[in-house]
Amino acid sequence: MGSVMSLGCSKRKATNQDVDSESRKRRKICSTNDAENCRFIQDESSWKHPWSLCANRVISVAAVALTNFRFQQDNQESNSSSLSLPSPATSVSRNWKHDVFPSFHGADVRRTFLSHIMESFRRKGIDTFIDNNIERSKSIGPELKEAIKGSKIAIVLLSRKYASSSWCLDELAEIMKCRQMVGQIVMTIFYEVDPTDIKKQTGEFGKAFTKTCRGKPKEQVERWRKALEDVATIAGYHSHSWRNEADMIEKISTDVSNMLNSFTPSRDFDGLVGMRAHMDMLEQLLRLDLDEVRMIGIWGPPGIGKTTIARFLFNQVSDRFQLSAIMVNIKGCYPRPCFDEYSAQLQLQNQMLSQMINHKDIMISHLGVAQERLRDKKVFLVLDEVDQLGQLDALAKETRWFGPGSRIIITTEDLGVLKAHGINHVYKVEYPSNDEAFQIFCMNAFGQKQPHEGFDEIAWEVTCLAGELPLGLKVLGSALRGKSKREWERTLPRLKTSLDGKIGSIIQFSYDVLCDEDKYLFLYIACLFNGESTTKVKELLGKFLDVKQGLHLLAQKSLISFDGERIHMHTLLEQFGRETSRKQFVHHGFTKRQLLVGARGICEVLDDDTTDSRRFIGIHLELSNTEEELNISEKVLERVHDFHFVRIDASFQPERLQLALQDLIYHSPKIRSLNWYGYESLCLPSTFNPEFLVELDMRSSNLRKLWEGTKQLRNLKWMDLSYSSYLKELPNLSTATNLEELKLRNCSSLVELPSSIEKLTSLQILDLENCSSLEKLPAIENATKLRELKLQNCSSLIELPLSIGTATNLKQLNISGCSSLVKLPSSIGDITDLEVFDLSNCSSLVTLPSSIGNLQNLCKLIMRGCSKLEALPININLKSLDTLNLTDCSQLKSFPEISTHISELRLKGTAIKEVPLSIMSWSPLADFQISYFESLMEFPHAFDIITKLHLSKDIQEVPPWVKRMSRLRDLSLNNCNNLVSLPQLSDSLDYIYADNCKSLERLDCCFNNPEIRLYFPKCFKLNQEARDLIMHTCIDAMFPGTQVPACFIHRATSGDSLKIKLKESPLPTTLRFKACIMLVKVNEELMSYDQTPMIVDIVIRDEHNDLKEKIYPSIYPSIYPLLTEHIYTFELDVEEVTSTELVFEFPQLNKRNWKIGECGILQRETRSLRRSSSPDLSPESSRVSSYDHCLRGD
């Protein structure tokens, strides 16, 4: 019986307290230096902001309300345990009586708008309070107050005559009281009324309010007035913004429905056992009250429940973070060793960002993108099943990649990976206690934590045989569920003789109860298709099995699960399936369908010259991670045949073995899936028969061509030859009428596609990215199902086919980097479903056809870097266009009035010299970037809409009217060599970047925004007063300087660390410091303008060398550009300071070329809260006091 019988299984029913107490003793919080040392730490709450209902990340009114509600709740509960779990009885905090309480003035809306929205609520199952049976009086009574308080959401429908009713005003006052006291969510609808009139009680609304207030007590009037002022500031739905009232109602009811879903407690984790103890331990490691970025490892054997714990933790705390994501089964997506490690890491990072920011088709070009996108975001990231350091390097290489307060959770079986990555916060997951194991088993066998009557004894016996492994308990319990006690008793003797507590025996039992067809499906998934989409598996195996029903049954038996569309089988189950397949050959020879998997299993079969000639159905061989040469008999390879599924990665293997393996294709005329990574031959064998082929995946191959002539391809659905850089041509594909995806990315030698492409009537995705030799596309007049066409960086492509207009279902067209493309066909306007059109860096393109005006579903038009583009079509209005980017279209002279719905307009680097008045009607416009031109002052209406201004090189002064740009956030003055001074500028500015302004001497201004960032690289003529102003009035700065200024009384003139002593008086909660560093070159041969950023950490330790903080500068986790004779300053907050001595260290990467020559620290004003909270001092007083403080040297 092995170790199972040593468990000493007890039938005693433990109390919850006993279970938790025992669990705590068995679980460890480990440091990587000593895996048995335990640490216990306290915790607090934090919160998450984004909650998006729309794919384009627009946050709805409902989402904002919900976020505020959650924030209030977090504030109210900040002193409680942040991971404390609700009991079943209290999982819903209140007994709600209604979903929605509407407050409205009946005469205005009851028979029109209100009746329609109530009907929409009814159709969506939203319970709305109706006051038909309440008798009206001068003031609202207890019944109505209870109805308001008992509603999850209050919707205030503000109309012109709303304030004419004292009843409505009393309702509103009560609603706003509930909002303040109990965090009730309040949504607003402004129906034919301006919020300003409500806030200020003006206009027709104000007249009605004045009339209602006559003769009323002053206290009551003030209560009404305060309620109106408050409700007017709540972002809501404006009827004036909607052309169609029905659309507005549908939007409101959908938002309300989605919000109500958040009130429904999750049942996804009901029935999990022992989670309270796991969360208590993890709480000590998470320390959500700290702003440091922390990585936590969850370490334990396979099947112990690491993934379940991580998912549960994610469910508990992820909504307190700005961004969150779970990356599952990472090791399955990252081969070892990796043929192209950089590409694999890039793909992993791409997947992470895609989930994190909800951008399905995100494209990244280098591994620094994650750091750039996430460095200021509070992130909760789970990295599941990590087994290589390279995976962590791709996804979470440094804590500086993420914003303050971020938490990265890594689950792994390998403690060495965590040690190598420097992760010293590790939670070791121990096996559950006897009582917990029994409850886990019972939950899966009986659907409750106790066995059914009469099953007590036998349930305990089976639990003991499961070896306390959660996966085994789950699988075995599911297998016995619903069976009679007699069936259990017949099964038990067999379990006792074959089970020794190992998971393989447990899975064997669950496997044996499957019918033969489901067993085959299980083995197919384990050996070939783990991680594949259900669609592909159904297509590939549908000929042999009832895949749909089989997948459903395997999922019920807990043998597989689904991650969206993809099938997931646990690693242990996969290992069991592969081992079972190998044993079948050993015990049964070729009497069963054979699946050859892994070098060991394949060698056992193929290294014996006596092996009979027999049929095989599938082979999965990964040899790229096998260093020793395999001894496979070539004679055997000649006799094994009839493979339907071939999956091989033989990279780095000897040519002899490569050629021998290719014989498998010769003798397999009915192949359905050929997946061969790094195929070495120049062409597939002439005898290769693709007639039955459904999937062809030959990525990173050495192919020059696939085959000669025309072959029958009627079953082919997926073809991927990406990264086959020597591929010069494709065969005739006219018979591939069912092909859905054709991927040829990075086939850089491919010159043209065959004309037979036009026969691909089922094609949905055509990916030709980086096919730099491709000169033309054939006609695609029959590609009516095409959804994505990717042609970016096809730099030799001269034109698009006229037939592209027949691709009426095309959603995304990317021709960025097609630098030889001169014009677009007029038929482009026939692609009426097009949503994203990217023409960036089409540097030869002169104009767009007027037919582009037909693209009424186009959301994004990106033409950045189209340097020859002279004009856009006129007299068109793309009603769906949201983003228009024309940056660096240097020949564009006319203003692009092609839509009135644009929210993001970028005209930097264009030759535009006017801003038409019509732009004022573009109500959605939120981001408007433009370069300066002399006549800009003639368009004062532009001053209220420009957010980013780029000044030209020849400018001699910044016009004084720039100060009037009330929304200006960014100002760039690069290479303005004649500029001598800066005048007073807009207080709205967040960022000024003045690079290489060689004559700039004075700053005749002050900066009233304490959060402003000022950068003046290579402005060497700046006088001392200007440099002092820059240094002391912003949170981040860069400017010329030869030494750390004397006002930094704590200085180190050599090295990158220094020690400071604080005053002995009581220390505040938070201390603020300004840090200053100056760089020196290590390599004197470097150019003075280094293009590589330098990463700088700030590590703060106390006198005991204990780490207090590890942070980075408040704007950049890296310094750029790197320049000598320049000063870099930035502010930082240090929280919970208890020591009177602090050591500041400035470790940096890129030390080969640069190092920190001098550094300094200046203690600023102290605050009890971080900068995100309300400051103690006004911006102006903060600026002056810190400036004086520095001059005095105190």
Swiss-Prot record:
This is Probable disease resistance protein RPP1. Its EC number is 3.2.2.6. Coiled coil: none annotated. Residues 1-27, 1170-1194 are annotated as: Disordered. It is an enzyme of class 3 (hydrolase). InterPro entries: Apaf_helical, C-JID, Disease_R_plants, Leu-rich_rpt_3, LRR_dom_sf, LRR_R13L4/SHOC2-like, NB-ARC, P-loop_NTPase. Disulfide bonds: none annotated. Belongs to the disease resistance TIR-NB-LRR family. GO terms for biological process: defense response; defense response to fungus; innate immune response-activating signaling pathway; positive regulation of plant-type hypersensitive response; response to oomycetes. NAD(+) binds at residues 105-110. GO terms for molecular function: ADP binding; ATP binding; innate immune receptor activity; LRR domain binding; NAD+ nucleosidase activity, cyclic ADP-ribose generating. It comes from the Eukaryota. Residues 96-260 form the TIR domain.
